Amino acid sequence: MAPGGGARTASSPALAILGSAPGDSHTATLVRRLTAGLACDLVDLGAISIAPFSPAQVYNPDSFLDVIAKMAAAPVTVFATPVYWYSYSAVMKGFIDRFTDLQLTHLQLGVRLRRREFALLASGSEAELEPALNIAFSRFCDSIGARCIALVYAREDGPFVDPGAVALVRRAMGEI
């Protein structure tokens, strides 16, 4: 069984969700480096439509629920974001805000994410990951019942700060 109770097969690829504005960014480069040689699908939030959270729960058709379904099937999901003003990018923050829907109107889909493995991959200009982002991501995982397996950080497109965190994520993605 996969985390969260769903059937996991050898063909279930990991999932990386890219939340950077330009498609060819430092963060996109880091995603390619982290996932090199592993089965991993990519969702570029900048290339799809996801409406901002609405308390009324009324949305024009968008891709949010499709992405959540992919996350529920993946052995691990990597949230990849540049660090802007000590936090996620705007597109990543908007995506995470929509998880409130899973606690209001899409409860069964939200349940499928419990005990799933999530990791954060961040790129920024500082020597280390911003502590506020670390806390925000860990609390996000806790709030939906997911397991935060690692926080991976690199300065722009430089070396990863913590090779141990990289190894944890790659193992979860199927590296032997």
Where are the language model's segments positioned?
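N-terminal beta1-alpha1-beta2 submodule of the flavodoxin-like/Rossmannoid cofactor-binding fold
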Residues: 1-109, 148-149, 153, 159-176
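Short, glycine-/small-residue-rich phosphate/pyrophosphate-handling segment
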Residues: 108, 112-151
